[in-house]
Amino acid sequence: MNISQKGIDFIKKWEGGPWLTAKRFGTEKYLSIGYGHYGPDVKMGMKITKSQAEDLLRKDIAGAVKHVNNINDKYHYDFNQNEFDSLTSFAYNIGSINQLTANGTRSKSVIADKMLLYNKSCGKVLPGLTNRRKAERELFLSKSGSGSKGETFTMEMKVITQGMTCGQV
C-alpha cells in the first residue's frame, strides 16, 4: 500500500512550511527545512525550492510508508487507505507505530485511542501535538472512500500550532 495524495496533504498541513530556508525549532539538535525534513544534512543558511521541499517530503515519507506496510503485513491488520494515511503521518512524526500496535496485540480501535497519548515533548503536553493526534485519530476512524449511500467522507483539519519543540509553547 502507498500513501494517498490526501495523506501527503495531511502531513504537509501538520508539518507546516514549506520552510525554504533552514531553521531551528526551539532547542532541537538539528535544523529543519521543507515539510519537516530534519537532520544533520540540513545546514544553517541552506535554501531549497518548493519543488525540492516536495521531493524531500516524498523521500522522507517513504521510510514511514515502509514501516507501516511492515506492521500491516506482519500482524495482518488489513488497514484501509485512511488508516494507512493516518499511521503514516504518525510514523513520519514520531518515527514508529510499534508503540500503538504493541506487536500486533491491539485492535484497531485501541490503536486509534492510543494515538492521543503521544502529545508531549520533553514531558510537556503541546497543543499542536494534541491537535495533530486528534486529527490523525479522526482520519484513522473515518471511512475510506464512499459510504453505502455513495457519500464521500472527508475531514477538515484545524492547524492550531505547528513546529513546536521543547521550550516553545
Name these PLM-found stretches.
Residues 1-24, 28, 37, 42-44, ...:
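Long, amphipathic alpha-helical surface segments
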